[in-house]
Amino acid sequence: MTDDLTGALTQPPLGRTVRAVADRELGTHLLETRGIHWIHAANGDPYATVLRGQADDPYPAYERVRARGALSFSPTGSWVTADHALAASILCSTDFGVSGADGVPVPQQVLSYGEGCPLEREQVLPAAGDVPEGGQRAVVEGIHRETLEGLAPDPSASYAFELLGGFVRPAVTAAAAAVLGVPADRRADFADLLERLRPLSDSLLAPQSLRTVRAADGALAELTALLADSDDSPGALLSALGVTAAVQLTGNAVLALLAHPEQWRELCDRPGLAAAAVEETLRYDPPVQLDARVVRGETELAGRRLPAGAHVVVLTAATGRDPEVFTDPERFDLARPDAAAHLALHPAGPYGPVASLVRLQAEVALRTLAGRFPGLRQAGDVLRPRRAPVGRGPLSVPVSSS
């Protein structure tokens, strides 16, 4: 552990990829880093509270960050912002990258899976399959419709089912497999690998269990091999990882809509509002809650001089509720005229190249649900994951169709 001149108590980076580190060293690193996050959270640091990932609702912690000004320093060693204007300038600037010099993680980046992890690479070009028009849209719509009809064949009957496991995850995964050309006999493997990779984005900033990290590392290698025959295998890999974001986005959208019944009824009456529902969800409760950057060279930010290697975190979810930009930001509103001013799934972010496909999957899922089950309602408690400060979405949502 190190205590630098800024007062930050941090863990030194591993300096090697997950695969190159023995279980004992990796496990110790994960436990000690998580302990540091708990200490800082207990001492009142809101960003450490976010990293700890124990709250169902992280938005109160985001507001505590906002109250500290446009840019504040966390004792975890990161500079943090919830300010929309500042965040936009960071995300669009070439002064910031995804890792330190020569691709080496900085201390605030808990671990590295190496060059094979698309979330640790600069994203420049659209990923494979990220052209959501024409034939691909038809494929996605057909698979979503078939999945829901298989779950609930009689639209006039009453059904109780788990939204994510029963419909959203199978439909989104199957549609992605079809778009990416995964062989039919490997699609069950594809789905299993994506489930093991669900905590991948969280694990880069928030320590997971040793078993979870090992499972994700192995799944990343297996998925890379599975997609190796793609015309653009790196892009295909990123597109596959976008499945998690699409599932989370859909889950967040449905929860927001069902919590505002008049908005759900509006969507059922006007299915064309599905795209607006997706954009408002991206503002209100996005699937990727934050985006981390590393300063490439000494720079000034919000009146502060930041050295090369400084770690800067954009709380994307918080910027979507910035009262300086959005009127009544705590209200979910399908008619909001400026919802698309959010910074979620930013083109320069890790999921930027697959943002169109993520949006398409969520839009189609909402249209399909609203068209078949206008009486849909939540029928039980929502289950959410822990240690998930980056990816936000429910694990389980019991619903009833009547």
UniProtKB/Swiss-Prot annotation:
GO biological process, one term: antibiotic biosynthetic process
Xref: CDD domains: AknT-like (cd11036)
Knockout or disruption consequences: Cells lacking this gene are not able to produce glycosylated macrolides.
InterPro entries from the UniProt entry: Cyt_P450, Cyt_P450_B, Cyt_P450_sf, P450-rel_GT_act
One annotated GO molecular function: monooxygenase activity
Keyword Amino-acid biosynthesis: no
Top-level lineage group: Bacteria
Keyword terms of this UniProt record: Antibiotic biosynthesis
Membership in a protein family: Belongs to the cytochrome P450 family.
Function of the protein: Involved in the biosynthesis of the macrolide antibiotics methymycin, neomethymycin, narbomycin, and pikromycin. DesVIII assists the folding of the DesVII polypeptide. However, unlike chaperones, it remains bound to DesVII during catalysis, forming a tight DesVII/DesVIII complex. Although the formation of the DesVII/DesVIII complex is essential for the catalytic activity, DesVIII is unlikely to be involved in catalysis directly.
Stored NCBIfam families: P450_rel_GT_act
Subunit field text: Forms a complex with DesVII.
Protein name as it appears in the record: Protein DesVIII
Organism: Streptomyces venezuelae
Gene: desVIII
